[in-house]
């Protein structure tokens, strides 16, 4: 895969430039565009992934299925499809926004900051996973309600963006409705 960049955003969340992804994520990460996707199988189970230990931010932490950054000139939907293929080796369908205006800023235990405008989507897996171990060290298909209970009981074991996304009542209802269809 070619070197990835993040699309930097100004105070009005408008693109203002790009920066190499690894260089962007520091103790003072600039605001940039991202996405988050919750992937479900045909049985309505959610794919929860554990981030590789080689990840710069939140290594080894459990999170939602796939996250990433649209590249300049790429739609969010195109970026989600690209990252699902790269990280999980999976094809997807029925890509649906569930929390289109999510944004957050969080600092990991090593001081690395995430500072993202991060629309959240749900999608359905249509092929068998072929996980990229450089991105994902473990994964689990689980019932959404069980994951929600785990997020409530042990939020520290999950990425802060996953906890924040699921804690939004409207987003949680949309995810629950999505997994039940």
Curated annotation (Swiss-Prot):
Give the metabolic or biological pathway: Isoprenoid biosynthesis; dimethylallyl diphosphate biosynthesis; dimethylallyl diphosphate from isopentenyl diphosphate: step 1/1
**Sequence positions that bind Mn(2+):** 25, 32, 69, 114, 116
Q: Which cofactor does it need?
A: Mg(2+); Mn(2+)
Q: How is the cofactor bound?
A: Binds 1 Mg(2+) ion per subunit. The magnesium ion binds only when substrate is bound.
- Domain of life here? Bacteria
GO CC annotation terms, alphabetical:
cytoplasm
What is this enzyme's class at the first EC digit? isomerase
Coarsely, its chief localization is: cytoplasm
**Sample GO molecular function, one term:** isopentenyl-diphosphate delta-isomerase activity
Q: Which residues form a coiled coil?
A: none
Q: Describe, as the record does, how this protein assembles with itself and its partners.
A: Homodimer.
Q: Which family does it belong to?
A: Belongs to the IPP isomerase type 1 family.
Which HAMAP family does the record associate with it?
Idi
Its recorded name reads Isopentenyl-diphosphate Delta-isomerase
Annotated organism of origin: Salmonella typhi
């Amino acid at each position: 895969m070619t070197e990835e960049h993040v699309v930097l955003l100004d105070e009005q969340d408008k693109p203002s430039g790009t920066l190499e992804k690894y260089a962007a994520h520091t103790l003072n990460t600039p605001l940039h565009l991202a996405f988050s996707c919750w992937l479900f199988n045909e049985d309505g189970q959610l794919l929860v992934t554990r981030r590789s230990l080689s990840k710069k931010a939140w290594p080894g932490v459990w999170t939602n299925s796939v996250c990433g950054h649209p590249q300049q000139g790429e739609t969010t939907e195109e970026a989600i499809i690209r990252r699902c293929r790269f990280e999980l080796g999976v094809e997807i369908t029925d890509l649906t926004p569930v929390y289109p205006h999510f944004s957050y800023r969080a600092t990991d235990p090593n001081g690395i900051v995430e500072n993202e405008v991060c629309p959240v989507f749900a999608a359905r897996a249509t092929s068998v996973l072929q996980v990229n171990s450089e991105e994902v060290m473990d994964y689990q298909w689980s019932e959404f309600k069980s994951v929600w209970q785990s997020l409530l009981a042990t939020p520290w074991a999950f990425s802060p963006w996953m906890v924040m996304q699921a804690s939004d009542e409207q987003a949680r209802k949309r995810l629950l409705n999505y997994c039940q269809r």
